[in-house]
């Protein structure tokens, strides 16, 4: 699964819309409150690690590094 689709699946799983996610990111982390900006980053694959961590946080998730078996 592409990272873009995976992130969108997490958003849907949490019962949120892109607008709600962007509003929370803007409120908590000072992101632009523009859905097209987030959508563009997901489409281009240009989301920075720090942005991914903030996105995970507003969705109620932690990014975890796990050693492969």
Language model: regions and residue ranges:
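DNA major-groove recognition helix of helix-turn-helix/homeodomain DNA-binding modules
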Residues: 50-64
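A short, Lys/Arg-rich alpha-helix, primarily the initiator
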Residues: 1-20, 24
């Amino acid at each position: 699964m592409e990272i873009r689709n995976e992130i969108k699946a997490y958003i849907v799983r949490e019962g949120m819309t892109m607008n709600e996610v962007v509003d929370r990111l803007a409120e908590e982390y000072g992101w632009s409150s523009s859905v097209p900006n987030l959508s563009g980053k997901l489409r281009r694959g240009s989301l920075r690690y720090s942005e991914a961590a903030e996105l995970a946080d507003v969705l109620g998730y932690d990014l975890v590094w796990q050693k492969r078996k």
